[in-house]
């Protein structure tokens, strides 16, 4: 098991949820914090701690998004018309690495980011190697021909029981998909309760 995989599973235990819904996640069998005091259920969490944990869960779910990037995305969501929480999720879900992950082209958000940064993904027919590129309705994602048969991709797209969210379409044989629309919070298949209202309250203090 790689260092990244070990650390991401430890994050799930630390934050008290399975962050990516992975069956291999250690949280499924050890649903308490890591460390010698991890099973102590008497520790109380402050109001600030609850808000902070909600933010950390959401940020960790999107992989290697830095705190600065996360705050900047939130600031942009605040400036947009409409509901800040819905805008925030819409912006996070329109990132190229997130869309690659949601289309099940990669088994994890980390692998999705790597596929993008290595130039293995095409956006509207052109190589796209920046994970944070924001997609628009109608944008087409495609895996480069030269890497379509690599095991990581083939195993990911062929995994049984997977579905593509309704705001995306994906054709497995051609490994091509389309970003159809900006999703609502209720559309996003989080494996935990995304308490976006707590994140908004935290960043609005």
From Swiss-Prot:
Record note on quaternary structure: Part of the 30S ribosomal subunit. Contacts protein S5. The interaction surface between S4 and S5 is involved in control of translational fidelity.
Organism of origin: Rickettsia massiliae (strain Mtu5)
InterPro entries: Ribosomal_uS4, Ribosomal_uS4_bac-type, Ribosomal_uS4_CS, Ribosomal_uS4_N, S4_RNA-bd, S4_RNA-bd_sf
Gene that encodes the chain: rpsD
Pfam families, per database record: Ribosomal_S4 (PF00163), S4 (PF01479)
Disulfide bond entries: none
Residue span, S4 RNA-binding domain: 94-157
Molecular function GO terms recorded: rRNA binding; structural constituent of ribosome
Protein name: Small ribosomal subunit protein uS4
Organism superkingdom: Bacteria
Top-level taxonomy: Bacteria, Pseudomonadati, Pseudomonadota, Alphaproteobacteria, Rickettsiales
GO terms (BP aspect): ribosomal small subunit biogenesis; translation
Family membership: Belongs to the universal ribosomal protein uS4 family.
GO cellular component, one term: small ribosomal subunit
Keywords assigned: Ribonucleoprotein, Ribosomal protein, RNA-binding, rRNA-binding
Ribonucleoprotein in keyword set: yes
Record bears the keyword Transmembrane helix: no
Protein's job: One of the primary rRNA binding proteins, it binds directly to 16S rRNA where it nucleates assembly of the body of the 30S subunit.
